[in-house]
Amino acid sequence: MILAHDVSGSGPLLVLLHGITEDRRSWDPVDFTDGFTVVRVDLRGHGASAAEEPYDIPTLATDVHDTLAQLAENDVIPGELPVIVGHSMGGIVATAYGALFPARAIVNVDQPLQLAGMQGQVQQAEGMLRGADFPLFIHGMFAQMAGGLDAEELARVNGIRSPRQDVVLGMWRPLLEDSPEELAALVSGLTRIPEDVPYLVITGLDAGPEYAAWLQREIPQAVQEVWQPPTHYPHLVDPARFVERVEAFVR
């Protein structure tokens, strides 16, 4: 699928992937255009992109790759390896991109990759997710993680959020239906990033020392940073710091 997108700036190629239920506008405060050709996309089932099964992570990563390939073929963007930056579920898609396709670097913003804990939480909420209380669950979940955002920015992000039940259920199908062993095998495949591809994790919600050790085993070159204040949105709490850090990491 060719995704809805916008392109701005000039320089090396950098791609921004939003989180689940959001769209590319979530990146509005984060300006990389002084130093990069920036491509922002709406992932499948989000924003202006088509809502069409399947919604598995490898398919979402392939959509991004196909969109970039078409843009490069049409000389809209430079034909070079991209820096892929993903927030939340977009961080998993960015990671999968690095496992499936050549990339210059991967940046994962506040998305743990060891999904066993998330699987338990999602399965406990399965009734709400599949029922009429779906919007209530989604808004409540993100409200708990929005620390650090001022009232204006929180209202902006919430105004972008557009939960589609079929899309969320499709993206979370492995969490709802796979065994723990099947989920672990899926994650193992998605984290097979070549060791010469730099991998940066910026998180506002500390997943703890056991997770940090697990990630170092899965992606040995990973650089992990925990920013304050505690939040799911470190890139929106301090966009200038985020841009500066990513620029320094990939230069």
Swiss-Prot record:
Q: Which reaction does it catalyse?
A: an N-acyl-L-homoserine lactone + H2O = an N-acyl-L-homoserine + H(+)
Q: What molecular function does GO assign, one term? A: monoacylglycerol lipase activity
Pfam family of the protein (one): Abhydrolase_6
GO biological process terms, semicolon-separated: acylglycerol catabolic process
What pH dependence of activity is documented? Optimum pH is 8.0. Little or no activity below pH 4.2.
Q: Which organism is it from?
A: Microbacterium testaceum (strain StLB037)
Any one of the GO CC terms: membrane
Protein name in the entry: N-acyl homoserine lactonase
- What keywords tag this UniProt record? Hydrolase
Q: What class of enzyme is it?
A: hydrolase
Q: Which SUPFAM superfamilies match?
A: alpha/beta-Hydrolases (SSF53474)
Temperature note from the UniProt entry?
Retains over 80% of maximum activity at 15 to 60 degrees Celsius. Activity is greatly reduced over 70 degrees Celsius.
Lineage of the native species? Bacteria, Bacillati, Actinomycetota, Actinomycetes, Micrococcales
Q: What does this protein do?
A: Hydrolyzes short- and long-chain N-acyl homoserine lactones with or without 3-oxo substitution at C3. Has slight activity towards L-homoserine lactone, and no activity towards gamma-butyrolactone.
Q: Which InterPro entries match?
A: AB_hydrolase_1 (IPR000073), AB_hydrolase_fold (IPR029058), AB_hydrolase_sf (IPR050266)
Keyword Nucleotide-binding belongs to the record:
no
Report the EC code(s) recorded for this entry.
3.1.1.81
Q: Which domain of life is it from?
A: Bacteria
